A protein has these predicted regions:
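Short polybasic linear motifs
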Residues: 270
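A polyanion-binding, active-site-adjacent surface
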Residues: 1-215, 221, 225-264
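Low-complexity, intrinsically disordered or signal/transmembrane-proximal segments
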Residues: 279-280, 287-290
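Short, intrinsically disordered C-terminal tails of secreted or membrane-associated proteins
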Residues: 292-294
Length: 297
């Protein structure tokens, strides 16, 4: 989709500056004056040739079941609240999900599983996320990807992750004043986030806990008077994980209820939108497949 051609919520225009390599990504991310301009610049990035080729090939050929649809076929910027309490970090858009719809975790089964949980936990207006412009709204939450473009086989390279990182650094820095909890969906996002947090000005713990479902630690903003931010690990809601039972609805709900409660995201969200908060609980540590703590009553 060319920028400025009427796609819902597309903030880019034909005049939006385009990054064609890592140095330009760093420059354009760091110099974006507002979150809106950062979003626009992310959405037209062409810094990684392999990812550009793949996302555009998928958008041109299209899956048979989506032949009649127009694909977004561009990088997927972050979306959600402008001043979120909860930041949700995923891996990358799906080729026929976000790359088609223009919004991460939208239009695929992983998104169906994720948004059902976000709705139950009061962090989304609807239990489904179909396409941009469907009325879905995140409540006191924002969603981003460690890599903004759909990668072949859902596996971005280390160089692609590192090239994309300045976009995430800039976005984290812009929303940092309001964020109180960060949920990492999967080990890739967990590992990618540590250098991003440091670059965005956070003080990290001396020992990084290993990734696991329910793993948690606190990071601190550079301002000593600012409250800590809770970092939570969560198994990715991929079909492989959800179909095999490695991650269940209760497991996802436990993580998001913990994030919502710690961050205070439910205090002014306009209602819970589903299951009341406090119905699931996590203790500090790594999830082994069973809930590690009793329900918080």
């Amino acid at each position: 989709v060319p920028p400025g051609t009427g796609w819902p919520h597309d903030l880019a225009t034909p005049a939006t500056r385009v990054a064609h390599g890592p140095a330009e990504v760093r420059d354009l991310a760091a110099s974006a004056p507002t979150l809106a301009e950062l979003t626009a610049r992310q959405s037209v990035c062409r810094a990684c040739p392999r990812l550009v080729s793949w996302r555009e090939e998928v958008a041109a050929v299209r899956r048979r079941s989506f032949q009649a649809e127009r694909y977004w076929g561009r990088p997927i910027p972050g979306w959600g609240a402008q001043a979120p309490r909860v930041l949700i970090v995923g891996l990358a858009p799906a080729a026929h999900g976000g790359n088609r719809t223009g919004r991460i975790f939208t239009g695929d089964r992983s998104g169906d599983f994720l948004f059902a949980s976000l709705y139950r936990c009061g962090l989304a207006d609807s239990p489904v996320s179909v396409t941009v412009g469907d009325g879905q709204r995140l409540r006191n939450a924002r969603m981003v990807a460690a890599v903004r473009c759909a990668p072949p086989a859902n596996k971005p390279t280390t160089d692609e992750r590192d090239t994309c990182a300045p976009w995430l650094v800039a976005e984290v820095a812009q929303v940092a004043p309001s964020v109180r909890a960060i949920v990492c969906l999967g080990g890739f996002a967990w590992q990618a986030l540590w250098p991003v947090l440091r670059a965005a000005g956070f003080v990290l713990p001396s020992r990084r806990p290993p990734f696991g479902h329910g793993a948690e630690t606190e990071v601190r903003p550079r301002d000593p008077d600012a409250p800590p931010v809770l970092l939570l690990g969560c198994y990715h809601p991929s079909q492989q994980n959800t179909f095999t039972g490695r991650v269940t609805p209760d497991m996802l709900d436990a993580v998001f209820t913990r994030a919502r409660g710690f961050s205070g995201a439910g205090e002014d969200s306009g209602g819970s939108g589903g299951r009341p908060p406090g119905q699931h609980g996590l203790r500090r540590g790594v999830h082994t497949g069973q809930r590690t703590g009793p329900p918080a009553l």
